[in-house]
């Protein structure tokens, strides 16, 4: 099966910093992947995100933009741009809490993987090969339709402390705008 790794160049950011994103279902080696992160294995410097906590492409792309922008401007609050992506998803300023709520856990089965090309040797091909070798799960398209099947709306609302957001038809759009607003406003002075 072809790996649906998507490479995105975000507007307003240097084209030399493309972002590689892949989405997986039925991942069965999350404990291994998490341990690689915890041990600081540089080969596994990715943002490993529990996909059930991602509402839409816009939601995660907003967090990525914020993290990469902070990276470029020397404002990282975490170890690297990849951990900053996970931290940027959180509406709070507690790094450990953001990893508990949004990062990979030993029980994660739906995984969103993000890699920023911070060095020239990080290419679409190198990321695709590495993920294919180490992620034991089924790659699926990184699309709003897929994310809507995976997203746990009640967990997301709880993490962002959001209640009812209006009529059923309007609720999804309001939720997405609330999530993006929370990412934009966190840490603003």
From Swiss-Prot:
Keywords recorded for this protein, A-Z: Activator, Chromosome, Nucleus, Telomere, Transcription, Transcription regulation, tRNA processing
Broad class of the protein's primary localization: nucleus
Keyword Aminoacyl-tRNA synthetase: no
Gene3D superfamilies for the chain: CGI121/TPRKB
Signal sequence coordinates: none
Gene Ontology, cellular component aspect: chromosome, telomeric region; cytosol; EKC/KEOPS complex; nucleus
InterPro entries referenced in this protein's UniProt entry, alphabetically: CGI121/TPRKB (IPR013926), CGI121/TPRKB_sf (IPR036504)
Example of a GO biological process term: tRNA threonylcarbamoyladenosine modification
Location within or outside the cell: Nucleus; Chromosome, Telomere
Summary of subunit composition and partner proteins: Component of the EKC/KEOPS complex composed of at least bud32, cgi121, gon7, kae1 and pcc1; the whole complex dimerizes.
Family label: Belongs to the CGI121/TPRKB family.
Function: Component of the EKC/KEOPS complex that is required for the formation of a threonylcarbamoyl group on adenosine at position 37 (t(6)A37) in tRNAs that read codons beginning with adenine. The complex is probably involved in the transfer of the threonylcarbamoyl moiety of threonylcarbamoyl-AMP (TC-AMP) to the N6 group of A37. Cgi121 acts as an allosteric effector that regulates the t(6)A activity of the complex. The EKC/KEOPS complex also promotes both telomere uncapping and telomere elongation. The complex is required for efficient recruitment of transcriptional coactivators.
Protein name, per record: EKC/KEOPS complex subunit cgi121
Organism: Aspergillus fumigatus (strain ATCC MYA-4609 / CBS 101355 / FGSC A1100 / Af293)
Gene name for this UniProt entry: cgi121
């Amino acid at each position: 099966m072809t790996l649906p790794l998507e490479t995105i160049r975000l507007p307003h950011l240097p084209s030399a910093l493309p972002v590689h994103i892949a989405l997986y279902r039925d991942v069965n080696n999350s404990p291994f992947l998490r341990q690689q992160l915890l041990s600081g294995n540089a080969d596994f410097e990715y943002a490993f995100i529990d996909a059930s906590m991602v509402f839409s492409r816009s939601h995660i792309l907003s967090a990525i933009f914020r993290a990469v922008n902070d990276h470029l401007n020397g404002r990282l609050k975490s170890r690297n741009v990849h951990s900053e992506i996970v931290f940027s998803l959180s509406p709070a300023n507690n790094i450990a809490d953001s990893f508990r709520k949004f990062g990979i856990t030993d029980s994660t089965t739906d995984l969103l993987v993000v890699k920023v090309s911070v060095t020239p040797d990080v290419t679409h091909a190198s990321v695709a090969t590495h993920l294919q070798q180490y992620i034991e799960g089924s790659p699926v398209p990184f699309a709003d339709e897929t994310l809507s099947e995976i997203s746990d709306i009640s967990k997301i609302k709880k993490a962002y402390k959001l209640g009812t957001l209006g009529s059923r038809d309007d609720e999804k759009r309001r939720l997405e705008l609330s999530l993006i607003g929370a990412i934009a406003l966190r840490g603003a002075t």
